[in-house]
Amino acid sequence: MKVLGIESSCDETGVAVYDTELSGVPALRAHAVYSQIALHAEYGGVVPELASRDHVRKLLPLIRQTLGEAGLRIDELDGVAYTAGPGLVGALLVGAGVARSLAWALDVPAIGVHHMEGHLLAPLMEDDPPQAPFVALLVSGGHTQLVSVKALGSYQVLGETLDDAAGEAFDKTAKMMGLPYPGGPQLAALAETGTPGRYKFARPMTDRPGLDFSFSGLKTQVLLAWRSSDQSDTTRADIARGFEDAVVDTLAIKCLRALDAAGCDTLVVAGGVGANKRLRARLQEAAQRRGGRVCFPRPALCTDNGAMIAFAGALRLQAGEHADAAVHVTPRWDMAALPPLAAQESGVGNRE
């Protein structure tokens, strides 16, 4: 089954083709992402109306490009998957409208995919994919969640952020210290040159039971440290390192607690912050110490992309699901409300 995936939930236009007749890395026949960073940079954040208009401009050319790279004609597709939520309503409607129109014209099924389920399942596209049950850390600019995955499609949220998401905290902290948009990756790069331990910030909510997160207080700590400093380049790097270490430690501590609570030893990490080098190293070290395993998607599939939507959509289409002809999107959508996935013959992601 060859499935076209379309991602348009925010400021990336992503398109991919996933082929269920293949497995591992080769099953992703082609994927392409267009980022709107340059468009939104002068505003210091995403402008929803501009995002929607840019998706309109870029989506069809990107579909043609991706099909060409996959070596496929459009009439060789067997299904179309699109992000139906959560996200910016206008941006979601662009992708959903194009996907539904293509599916109708080609007489193939379409399926709306939960954006965060796409992220959660992205590591399953790699060689030697993780098998459920496992715990997933979904960590991005808009979400920070710990999810117990008993089987594919069966999700229980164990903990989540009470205020800022981790990626959002990275971006806002970077902006406080004068780094250009988007600040998160810039701050992480700057932290590489910082001196460890010169600035030590709190590890929020790790001194009490529970699996929820809070990063607003940490952000305030950093702001006060920055304002009272000499604001030199060296100090900026040292504060960035202290902030990143605090976030990474907090995420790692909560992940280990979640594994204990769920009674399993496999951790899946996905979302844009999952590409952070220090977070990857810290979680791999922690997993090795407890004799467990941590699984990440390749860095290119950590940020928003069409590949994860094509893959998640393919699994649900194979299970017999499909969307009706109407164009529906859900800007706010609880992943725990998703229907469980029927067991696949391939056994992808589920232990026997």
Swiss-Prot record:
Family annotation (InterPro entries): ATPase_NBD (IPR043129), Gcp-like_dom (IPR000905), KAE1/TsaD (IPR017861), Peptidase_M22_CS (IPR017860), TsaD (IPR022450)
Entries under PROSITE patterns matching the protein: GLYCOPROTEASE
Residues holding substrate: 138-142, 171, 184, 276
GO biological process, one term: tRNA threonylcarbamoyladenosine modification
Binding site for Fe cation: 115, 119, 304
Catalytic activity annotation: L-threonylcarbamoyladenylate + adenosine(37) in tRNA = N(6)-L-threonylcarbamoyladenosine(37) in tRNA + AMP + H(+)
Pfam families hit by this protein: TsaD
Cofactor(s) for this UniProt protein: Fe(2+)
UniProt cross-references to PANTHER family, sorted A to Z: TRNA N6-ADENOSINE THREONYLCARBAMOYLTRANSFERASE (PTHR11735), TRNA N6-ADENOSINE THREONYLCARBAMOYLTRANSFERASE, MITOCHONDRIAL (PTHR11735:SF6)
Described purpose of this protein according to its UniProt entry: Required for the formation of a threonylcarbamoyl group on adenosine at position 37 (t(6)A37) in tRNAs that read codons beginning with adenine. Is involved in the transfer of the threonylcarbamoyl moiety of threonylcarbamoyl-AMP (TC-AMP) to the N6 group of A37, together with TsaE and TsaB. TsaD likely plays a direct catalytic role in this reaction.
Family (UniProt): Belongs to the KAE1 / TsaD family.
Protein's recorded name: tRNA N6-adenosine threonylcarbamoyltransferase
Gene: tsaD
